[in-house]
Amino acid sequence: MSKKEKQFVEEITPMEVDFAQWYTDVIKKTDLVDYSPVKGFMVIKPYGYAIWENIQNYMDKRFKETGHKNCYFPLLIPESLLKKEAEHVEGFAPEVAWVTHGGNEELAERLCVRPTSETIICEMYSKWLTSYRDLPFLYNQWCSVVRWEKSTRPFLRTSEFLWQEGHTLHETYEEAQAETLQMLNIYRETAENLLAMPVVIGQKSEKEKFAGAYATYTMEALMHDGKALQAGTSHNLGQHFTTAFDITYSDRNGELKHPYHTSWGVSTRLIGGIIMVHGDNRGLVLPPGIAPTQVVIVPVASHKEGVLDKANELRDRLKDKFRVELDDRDNYSPGWKFNEWEMKGVPIRIEIGPRDIENNQAMLFRRDELEKDAVSLDDLEEAVEKLLEDINNNLLYKAKMMRDEKTYIVKTFDEMKEVMEIKPGFVKAMWCGERACEEHVKAETGVTIRCIPFEQENLGHTCAFCGKEAKHMVYLAKAY
């Protein structure tokens, strides 16, 4: 192996040494992204985009199963629309990118580059809705948004990112609330079943909720370094936007009413979460459901008669059921290929050589445990299918164990400070529910309330931070 090849495969900073550099090394060396000339605007390369496509395909199917339809709304939004909902514009104003010229001519009105689409969608809904018979509106769009971030990191916080945003209208508050929680549950199911990423679900505090929302619900995941990642949100917007945009319909009694509105979204930051939950010092570890290549076949001693033919035969047997690739490159050794595919996180590697052919077997290597076993070629399809299922279950189990080991209960502010300094992670504590107390905690420690979980625990009767009567048990953490 040449020095260049050795560096390409092995030079990943250990996560225990420098987690941020480990993350950067992994995304670069596995060819997920590249940096563009504009800060914060990343290029998602084919391997990274294939991961997003697999997430997108899974979720799009779930959306359609629950009655939602896809559409597309414009990228540019007139400033006057953004100003219609005061709380919303105040929340997004620092992050908005503006278009001021068309060609060489200054525009009569500034246009903002979509940071989120509530305003333009509500403007259109006001024209489309007339009667209660039109409801519910169940629409989603897949697009990119721009939020001018000062500090950026690929997938986790970028000035442009890909996402989906659903926007629905309903007759009653109860229907809107049911929709909000239904979509949050779809996100949770996607995170745990597809991404093997355990999440805590709950409600955001008033301080942390979406600008203009009646209530925001979230799913929060814990990364290897003990920081939290907000992995998806679902908002009950009440009648805030529908009133501001004069969206009305004639109800069953012929009276004009404002409908109730929801919005919900997840983005490519899920990919950052997958990397930081499952990855190790060899590189990516991808859950089978999203891996661009689920199975890679590497011939050993491919120059020997029959080896390459058998490898092609195995690929043809597997390709209709699995995403499979045959690495028949003749300018790299099998050992180099093993290291490269491990770094790229492919769940299963099949090794086939002359002795394997003689014994009617292949060696199956699993990326999650770095173990290999011989499997009869007669049982190959069944063995691969079972192993992929085992890998997904094992990744979820290990991620839950990691999260639980990094989750702590504290009773006092000093105790939380000590825990967060020594061993960052999720902290569970009782909280009074007051904004001033929450702001004090953040100002003192940089720790935020991640959510008020649906599954409440009684850890005491007083707030851990100010001593007042406690209202909720909350999860806190430093976050991306």
Swiss-Prot record:
GO terms for biological process: prolyl-tRNA aminoacylation. Keywords: Aminoacyl-tRNA synthetase, ATP-binding, Cytoplasm, Ligase, Nucleotide-binding, Protein biosynthesis. Its main location: cytoplasm. Its EC number is 6.1.1.15. GO terms for molecular function: ATP binding; catalytic activity, acting on a protein; proline-tRNA ligase activity; transferase activity. GO terms for cellular component: aminoacyl-tRNA synthetase multienzyme complex; cytoplasm. It comes from the Bacteria. It is an enzyme of class 6 (ligase). It is found in: Cytoplasm. It catalyses: tRNA(Pro) + L-proline + ATP = L-prolyl-tRNA(Pro) + AMP + diphosphate. PANTHER family: BIFUNCTIONAL GLUTAMATE_PROLINE--TRNA LIGASE (PTHR43382:SF2), PROLYL-TRNA SYNTHETASE (PTHR43382). HAMAP family: Pro_tRNA_synth_type3. Belongs to the class-II aminoacyl-tRNA synthetase family. ProS type 3 subfamily. Homodimer. NCBIfam families: proS_fam_I (TIGR00408). Consists of three domains: the N-terminal catalytic domain, the anticodon-binding domain and the C-terminal extension. Catalyzes the attachment of proline to tRNA(Pro) in a two-step reaction: proline is first activated by ATP to form Pro-AMP and then transferred to the acceptor end of tRNA(Pro). This is Proline--tRNA ligase. The lineage of its organism: Bacteria, Bacillati, Bacillota, Clostridia, Peptostreptococcales. The gene is proS.
